[in-house]
């Protein structure tokens, strides 16, 4: 194998596939990146047990030449070292040449590296998926969905299915849900689909996979195809395939958890409320419990307090809009609510309570496409 390639494009693609490579794998060849050069361009692949990423660099795009393939072939090179090398090379062009026994020369300007490669035939093949369940989303929307849900997945492996985000489609609406059993984040969005009958549920994508995918997605309206099978999902971008395994197990039915009516409710400015809770958390965080207390005072005002006996107390009154219903005193995990407020994209939010010991709902005031649910904290 022998090719010359543009350094910037190569570095970008090596970075993408490196996201799928784990140094802790039990299969030695998966610590490497597979590189294939043929008459169409160069293909890079990185994989671990959860994620596989394949990117393709065409010979040319528009009037720009990306790569010149002088001899077709393939090699597997140790990912961590290889990624560091190509980042640091001095010139705009990189030449890669595989000789006998998989020894690979990487040349740029006066810099020359010789790396020991591995047999590419031993690298596992990527799955070929049946494309029966396919739908489309703009990259920006998917990036938003991930940002607004994945923070709420569980970090505990005691219930592995809760470490992922549940995707389901019904009546042309994609609903994505994440919960760690103390909080829940949900986002809904209409989708383009190739089949009017397309419906599925219990498609649980690991949070780790979605975090890595989010780093690759652009903030644009370019559509990507999402393919769902029994145990894998595939995100098809231009010149990139991103595979993720699905988590096994039955995801809890969350629709019934969300209260339909409220005993106390109000609206509040998102940023102002976030800043109030962040100030309160300064004390409750020191007490390690992260508990913040909220009490209705009347005249549209609620009081936010946090107490750490050995340090002190903070109290702040917050003006609300439309405060109505019963008097309320409630305690909650401040960090969980702050995490949710940081991903809300509306200027104001509505908060609905059904009692001091019942879950409460936080949602944007200007649309019904997302909501957050929180369990209160018992403080006595």
From Swiss-Prot:
Subunit structure of this chain's protein: Forms a ring-shaped head-to-tail homodimer around DNA which binds and tethers DNA polymerases and other proteins to the DNA. The DNA replisome complex has a single clamp-loading complex (3 tau and 1 each of delta, delta', psi and chi subunits) which binds 3 Pol III cores (1 core on the leading strand and 2 on the lagging strand) each with a beta sliding clamp dimer. Additional proteins in the replisome are other copies of gamma, psi and chi, Ssb, DNA helicase and RNA primase.
SMART domains the UniProt entry points to: POL3Bc
Function statement: Confers DNA tethering and processivity to DNA polymerases and other proteins. Acts as a clamp, forming a ring around DNA (a reaction catalyzed by the clamp-loading complex) which diffuses in an ATP-independent manner freely and bidirectionally along dsDNA. Initially characterized for its ability to contact the catalytic subunit of DNA polymerase III (Pol III), a complex, multichain enzyme responsible for most of the replicative synthesis in bacteria; Pol III exhibits 3'-5' exonuclease proofreading activity.
Protein name, UniProt field: Beta sliding clamp
Single Gene Ontology MF annotation: DNA-directed DNA polymerase activity
Pfam families per the UniProt record, alphabetical: DNA_pol3_beta, DNA_pol3_beta_2, DNA_pol3_beta_3
Keywords: Cytoplasm, DNA replication, DNA-binding, DNA-directed DNA polymerase, Nucleotidyltransferase, Transferase
UniProt record similarity statement: Belongs to the beta sliding clamp family.
Database matches in PANTHER family: BETA SLIDING CLAMP (PTHR30478:SF0), DNA POLYMERASE III SUBUNIT BETA (PTHR30478)
Domain of life, source organism: Bacteria
Cellular localization per UniProt: Cytoplasm
Annotated Gene Ontology cellular component terms: cytoplasm; DNA polymerase III complex
Cross-referenced NCBIfam families: dnan
Gene that this sequence comes from: dnaN
GO aspect biological process, one term: DNA strand elongation involved in DNA replication
Matching Gene3D superfamilies: 3.70.10.10, DNA Polymerase III, subunit A, domain 2
Coiled coil (residue ranges): none
